[in-house]
């Protein structure tokens, strides 16, 4: 069990690297990964099942302690990223399938990787976890409505079908995880250390499947999509941070909201695009998955070093006194 725990910890710590490696492999050897496309929803369901296994009462304490911060985080999550996605799609005159793909990822809840990045950034991790959890639980209703509102300009959208898909891929697996944890608490406590490894496998499988199935599209439109994804992600971080700052949240909470808004559940975006739209519509989600892990790591490192530098400065000033 110790070996699995160590492997799982290593996989979680190097998550972004594995996503990049398998994205490159999917692009270079597409025939090895295209078969995974049929199982994208299943892989996402496994990840969400793992989330259900790890949920606990403490995750909702922040909602009770500072409800307004959690509410602001969820509202920011579901307004900033969809609006930025729509603005980029409309302003840059993106092709319909790419526009819908960008809007899809923008309308998704926050990704669980944001909790890790917030922790590394010395941010308010409890707030990050609460916002991710609440936004994910609201996703079956909110995400389809937002997609219908913002994407109907380019392609027809069926919110009912999207609602059912999100129930199947997100909410039902989370509930199943909670039920399993309720009846098999001791067994789950022993197995929970392997969940980061399971999540990494699930995400790299989804990314490699989308990339391998869109090799030609990436050769034609990859640079455009990558540029839009970088803008989308970066503007999300900035506006999330400014929103929290304007509302006078403390600095750790500002960092949490910035990361929470900027990082999306791109696996859900890829699953919805694959099931309801074209393969090309899934590409922005796949690229977002690669990029936001890189940018999130860089931002977390910057903020972490800033905190350490400040602490070192205060220690030296105390010594001089």
From Swiss-Prot:
GO terms under cellular component: plasma membrane
Membrane topology type: Multi-pass membrane protein
Extracellular side: 1-6, 58-69, 121-129, 181-190, 243-267
One example of a Gene Ontology biological process annotation: sodium ion transport
Pfam families assigned: SBF (PF01758)
Key words of the record: Cell membrane, Ion transport, Membrane, Sodium, Sodium transport, Symport, Transmembrane, Transmembrane helix, Transport
Family per similarity comment: Belongs to the bile acid:sodium symporter (BASS) (TC 2.A.28) family.
Protein name as annotated: Uncharacterized sodium-dependent transporter YocS
Annotated source species: Bacillus subtilis (strain 168)
């Amino acid at each position: 069990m110790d070996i699995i725990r160590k492997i799982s910890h290593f996989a979680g710590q190097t998550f972004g690297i594995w996503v990049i490696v398998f994205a490159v492999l999917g692009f270079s050897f597409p025939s090895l990964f295209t078969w995974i496309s049929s199982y994208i929803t299943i892989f996402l369901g496994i990840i969400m099942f793992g989330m259900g296994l790890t949920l606990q009462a403490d995750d909702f304490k922040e909602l009770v302690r500072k409800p307004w911060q959690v509410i602001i985080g969820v509202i920011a999550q579901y307004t900033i990223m969809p609006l930025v996605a729509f603005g980029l799609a409309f302003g840059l005159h993106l092709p319909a399938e790419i526009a819908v793909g960008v809007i899809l990822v923008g309308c998704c809840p926050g990704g669980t990787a944001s909790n890790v990045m917030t922790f590394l950034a010395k941010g308010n991790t409890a707030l990050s976890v609460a916002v991710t959890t609440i936004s994910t639980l609201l996703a079956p209703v909110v995400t389809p409505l937002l997609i219908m509102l913002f994407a109907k300009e380019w392609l027809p959208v069926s919110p009912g079908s999207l609602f059912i898909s999100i129930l199947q891929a997100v909410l039902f697996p989370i509930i199943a995880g909670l039920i399993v944890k309720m009846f098999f608490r001791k067994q789950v406590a022993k197995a929970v250390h392997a969940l980061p490894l399971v999540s990494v496998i699930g995400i790299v499988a989804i990314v490699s499947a989308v990339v391998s199935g869109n090799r030609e599209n990436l050769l034609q439109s990859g640079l455009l999509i990558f540029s839009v994804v970088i803008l989308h992600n970066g503007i999300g971080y900035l506006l999330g941070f400014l929103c929290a700052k304007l509302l006078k949240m403390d600095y750790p909470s500002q960092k949490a909201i910035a990361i929470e808004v900027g990082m999306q559940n791109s696996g859900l975006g890829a699953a919805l695009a694959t099931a309801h739209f074209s393969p090309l519509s899934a590409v922005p989600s796949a690229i977002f998955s690669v990029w936001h892990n890189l940018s999130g790591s860089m931002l977390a490192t910057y903020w972490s070093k800033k905190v350490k530098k400040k602490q070192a400065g205060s220690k030296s000033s105390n010594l001089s006194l």
